[in-house]
Amino acid sequence: MDHQVSLPQSTTTGLSFKVHRQQRELVTPAKPTPRELKPLSDIDDQQGLRFQIPVIFFYRPNLSSDLDPVQVIKKALADALVYYYPFAGRLRELSNRKLAVDCTGEGVLFIEAEADVALAELEEADALLPPFPFLEELLFDVEGSSDVLNTPLLLVQVTRLKCCGFIFALRFNHTMTDGAGLSLFLKSLCELACGLHAPSVPPVWNRHLLTVSASEARVTHTHREYDDQVGIDVVATGHPLVSRSFFFRAEEISAIRKLLPPDLHNTSFEALSSFLWRCRTIALNPDPNTEMRLTCIINSRSKLRNPPLEPGYYGNVFVIPAAIATARDLIEKPLEFALRLIQETKSSVTEDYVRSVTALMATRGRPMFVASGNYIISDLRHFDLGKIDFGPWGKPVYGGTAKAGIALFPGVSFYVPFKNKKGETGTVVAISLPVRAMETFVAELNGVLNVSKG
């Protein structure tokens, strides 16, 4: 199957190339695996995680190696599924909307492809950052595979480039794992590709540790992130959306910090998130009394002590507390106001908070988080996705999420580490907004940063 890909003139140099895909196939575990039904946790199967997320990795050629990345990854995938065998199964919905993996061993979808383009051409065209205009060709959406239930839990496509580099793209069912869990799986995949006989960190299921019966559930905190939905999402209002990536070096983070009191300790996540939240609110121009939310996706593994989770636990272990303020306050008050809200929200997460979320899911039917007026940020910089190394080709030029927004929620951004063509390191943030709002957002962002730098 040959497909012509043309990159938009607005974001690239007009580069176009063809992708030839082989027939899709199912990769099954290399050895027999248990046939069993494994329930997900109460964190896993909430409504807000019932979608699939694409990630993508670009690798430079190694002309001194004659290994074929397609075959290396395909074999490693079959080997990895012996240890991560639930990924080779299919998701079923039980009573009370409880999800469970039917470990059938049917396998994961795998596509082999070739593209008549070199990595250097993509790099020159600034096409190695999300949103990737050619994503649908490098991670083909196999018909019927994008549902959550009764479909393969992983979709993998490996595309050889004419320079002998390659692109590794993967789509995963979010109910099965989070960023930390995906990193564990991919590291295991790399270890097996490089000759190890077993993952150095054995995978652990143990989803019962984050599951509670409705009769024993005790909601001990207020969880405004799961308020009943009210109002209309100011982003998803039917207006055409445009996505764009922004690159923040240490220089930009320092410029943002000049807007804050010098004695106010803060992390780069807090400084950048407060700044983006404020700029985004200005760009969307909502009614001044509209409640605006900044949802922090917080990895909670370190919070759990009774009992602690084993290092190989690869299920979802995050909570999504929301900082909430009116649009008027976000826009009119100093940036310190937004930053302190974020700090307070982060500090509210304790082990009891995590247990309270599991109880809420069990008693309220696994509700959806609030989408209206919500900006969701997930920091992937600590998950080592930029270190996914299959051997001769080294670390990826880019490794991380493939688009701004997720599923039906455009108001989501991921922080991804990146080194640009100049060798400068920083954080890439992809943002999706209506066209007019994006223009305002860019003007506000640049205006504030330029003044602060000056």
Curated annotation (Swiss-Prot):
GO biological process assignments: green leaf volatile biosynthetic process
Disulfide links within the chain: none
Tissue-wise expression: Expressed in leaves and stems. Lower levels in flowers and barely detected in roots and siliques.
UniProt superkingdom: Eukaryota
Active site positions, chain numbering: H174 (proton acceptor), D389 (proton acceptor)
Disruption phenotype: Loss of (3Z)-hex-3-en-1-yl acetate production.
EC number of the protein: 2.3.1.195
Enzyme superclass (EC): transferase
Alphabetically ordered keywords of this record: Acyltransferase, Transferase
Activity regulation text: Inhibited by magnesium, calcium, cobalt, zinc and copper.
Induction statement: Up-regulated by wounding with a peak 3 hours after wounding.
Catalyses which reaction(s): (3Z)-hex-3-en-1-ol + acetyl-CoA = (3Z)-hex-3-en-1-yl acetate + CoA
GO molecular function: (Z)-3-hexen-1-ol acetyltransferase activity; acetyl CoA:(Z)-3-hexen-1-ol acetyltransferase activity
Pfam families (alphabetical): Transferase
pH profile: Optimum pH is 7.1-7.3.
Function in brief: Acyltransferase involved in the production of green leaf volatiles (GLVs). Uses acetyl-CoA as substrate, but not malonyl-CoA or benzoyl-CoA. Prefers primary, medium-chain-length, aliphatic alcohols.
Annotated family: Belongs to the plant acyltransferase family.
Annotated PANTHER family: ACYL TRANSFERASE 4 (PTHR31147), OS05G0315700 PROTEIN (PTHR31147:SF66)
Name this protein carries in UniProt: (Z)-3-hexen-1-ol acetyltransferase
Lineage: Eukaryota, Viridiplantae, Streptophyta, Embryophyta, Tracheophyta
Gene: CHAT
